[in-house]
Amino acid sequence: MILQALTAYYEQLLKQGKVEAPGWDSKFKVSYELRLGPDGQLLALNDLRQEVPKGKKTVIAPRELPVPHRVKRASGVAANFLCDNTSYLLGADEKGKPERSRQCFEACAALHHKVLDGVDSPAAKAILAFFDSWNPAAASTHPLLAEQWADLNNNANLVFGYESPDGAHWLATTDDAIRAAWQSAFDTSDADAETARCLITGKEAGIARIHPAIKGVMGAQAAGAALVSFNAPAFCSYGHEQGANAPVSEYAAFAYTTALNLLLADRNCCQRIGDTTIVCWAENAAPAYSNAMLMFFCGGSEARGVSESDLAAALKALSQGRPVSFLDDKLDPNQNFYVLGISPNAARLSVRFFLHSSFGQFAKNLQDHADRLSITRPAFDKRENLSVWALAQETVNQRSRDKNPSPQLVGDLLRAILTGGPYPATLLNGVTLRIRAEREVTRGRAAILKAYYLRNYPTELNKEVFTVSLNESSNVPYVLGRLFSVLETIQSVANPGINATIKDRYFNSACATPATAFPTLVKLAQKHLQKMSTPNEVHFSKQLTELMAQLPETGFPARLSLPEQGAFEIGYYHQTQKRYAKKNEEE
């Protein structure tokens, strides 16, 4: 299903003229042009690199150009057509292995003769003449190369160019005769390959022995990683080798890898969260869909010129099945949409999840998630929404050396949000541990508690307790949380400037075993009330009386279950935020 969806995406891009035909890589980083004359002599070395913004500064980066399809190299010698590094095009490098460099150059020359022999093109003849006359031993001292030799050997890719006698010049990759010759060679390259019925297209075709590499996944090898590979006998069946174990045609292998590489290269289509790289796309290949989706669950809309209010309005409309205009495009809630999560695993990629639904259904799931997370927030917290990464960070000790949340948690949380499924138990466990360790109920942690119990245990009682702001529920654990917040306030007012409050010593015991903590705290509060001015004493005494009246006659509960502790923590958070809100209004 993944490969079929990616192949269909490639074919849609091909119809729209946004990608090259099979046999060509649409975007490949090229640093220099080797410009040749009619006799194959090197006329110039042209720097193709350009200035590109990177963060707040500008850097020099290679230019992305369409080039003939690249071979996947392991450890052997394998030449590319028209575009390669110095080892292949010049027969020299700084790796200290001149014999291997010579073999690379000879392999490259043989490939170009195989493709271009007999081609009626001045550029083709110039390239062949270059290979026939070039002296690799003199490459590093060539007057046109010596000054840039260090840069040329710093992982730079070079491409052939041609200059005619009248001064006109062009890249060999744009020469019509050369392109036609390469296309013919590529189309017949699998003539000797093993044939089988392709699992993606359903057609009999030559099977790809090794699939092209996937590049752009953070944490994977720089040379690329494989989504489909068989590198040990244990993975093979019925005597098949390599790609024959899962027959995918050369065309389909090229199509799905081209599509995925393009998505990974587009920051509007992919996002890294933890060790998971998320890639998303619409069936019609309109970029506005993936752009909007990443804004919905990763944030960052302001940087892309979309206000959070406009983003929220678009999400709500789509969740209700209404089309909206977004980024100069119209988003249709019925459009098929795909979300793929992949993680690096040495030379391979692991699929964390693959989801397919209508764009409107994804929007509804995200809207429901946002509604469950909604909770009153402190005045200093300006965030309208909490991103997936922000939620995962609430489970991490920010004082530890490793501040990254569990990769498994991030993947499970993403899946739950996008599918509308139950939140992972590890999310609740992580938040509960942090609250117990730090005795701090932050906005993020309170929002997670609220969302978790409303989604995983949608009882009427939970709907009554886990609300956006303070409510008058008589639920005992919730009332106890509010009571603890009031007791903490009484202590702070009676003893202004104290370094530690009852929260630091009693929060965990009051939350888990109220009967052991609250009698002591209530007695302590009576002493604190005696230190206050009359208006404050009357105000807080009234609050205490109202809350104590909602507790059972049997007294404080001996212990609270985990869900009841969640209600306690939400009650504490609500009451504390009410206090801060009132203080801000007075100021």
Regions found by a protein language model. Name each.
Residues 201-204:
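Short Cys/His-rich metal-coordination motifs, predominantly Zn2+-binding knuckles/fingers
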Residues 207-211, 268-269:
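Short, solvent-exposed secondary-structure capping/transition elements
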Residues 1-190, 235-587:
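Conserved phosphate-interacting/catalytic interface
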Residues 190-196:
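Short metal-coordination and nucleic-acid-contact micro-motifs, chiefly zinc-binding Cys/His arrays
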Residues 209-245:
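Short microdomains enriched in Cys/His and/or Lys/Arg
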